[in-house]
C-alpha cells in the first residue's frame, strides 16, 4: 500500500469517527472502536522496519501492557480503581486483549516519531520524548474513553496516579523497543490524528 493511500485511510477514519460520534449513530460508532484500532495499528506496522528484534520487542510490549492492565483492573494498582466495559471487545481476566494492541500502537507511533525527531538523540532522550507524547495522549483520551463507556474510573475521573503510572509503563515500553525503532512516515500523522480526535471531544461533546 502506498503512503498516500495509508494517509488517506488514517484521515478519513478519524474524521468519520469524529463526526459519527456526534450523531444519532454514536452508540453504533463506538462498536467500531476495535476495528479502528486494528486498522490503525496495521497501517502503522506496515511502514515499520519489521526487524526480528522489533517484532519481539513489540510482542513484549503487548505482554507488558496487557499484564499491567490486568493487574490494574483486578487490584486497583497502579492506575487506580477502574473497570472496562464492553466497547473494546473480548476480555482476558476482565481486561480487553485489544488494550495490549493499543499499548503497542502508541509505543510504536510515539517511539518512531521520537526516533525521527531526535535523529541524533540518545536512547534515553528518545524514550523520554516518546513517553511524554504518550502521556499527553492519555490526558486527552481519559475523559473521552469515559464518555464512550470504554472504561470507567471510580469517582468518574482518572486519579493522578494513573498518569504517573502511565508514564512509567510507557517509559519501560519505550526502553524495550528503543534499539529497534526507526523513522516511520505514518507515525506523525497517526499521532496528530489521534490527538486532534480526542482534543476535539473537549470542544465538541459526544452525542451520548
Regions found by a protein language model. Give the residues of each.
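Aromatic-rich, lipid-facing transmembrane alpha helices and their immediate juxtamembrane interface loops
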Residues: 1-208
Amino acid at each position: 500500500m502506498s503512503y498516500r493511500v495509508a494517509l488517506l485511510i488514517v484521515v478519513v477514519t478519524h474524521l468519520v469517527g469524529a463526526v459519527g460520534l456526534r450523531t444519532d449513530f454514536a452508540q453504533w460508532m463506538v462498536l467500531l472502536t476495535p476495528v479502528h484500532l486494528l486498522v490503525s495499528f496495521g497501517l502503522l506496522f506496515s511502514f515499520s522496519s519489521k526487524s526480528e528484534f522489533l517484532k519481539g520487542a513489540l510482542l513484549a510490549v503487548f505482554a507488558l501492557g496487557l499484564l499491567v492492565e490486568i493487574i490494574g483492573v483486578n487490584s486497583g494498582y497502579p492506575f487506580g480503581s477502574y473497570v472496562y466495559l464492553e466497547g473494546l471487545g473480548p476480555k482476558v481476566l476482565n481486561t480487553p486483549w485489544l488494550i495490549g494492541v493499543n499499548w503497542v500502537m502508541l509505543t510504536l507511533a510515539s517511539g518512531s516519531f521520537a526516533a525521527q525527531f531526535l535523529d541524533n538523540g540518545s536512547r534515553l532522550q528518545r524514550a523520554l520524548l516518546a513517553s511524554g507524547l504518550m502521556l499527553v495522549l492519555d490526558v486527552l483520551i481519559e475523559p473521552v474513553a469515559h464518555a464512550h463507556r470504554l472504561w470507567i474510573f471510580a469517582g468518574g475521573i482518572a486519579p493522578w496516579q494513573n498518569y504517573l503510572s502511565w508514564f512509567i509503563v510507557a517509559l519501560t515500553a519505550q526502553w524495550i523497543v528503543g534499539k529497534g525503532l526507526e523513522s516511520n512516515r505514518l507515525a506523525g500523522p497517526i499521532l496528530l490524528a489521534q490527538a486532534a480526535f480526542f482534543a476535539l471531544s473537549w470542544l465538541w461533546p459526544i452525542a451520548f
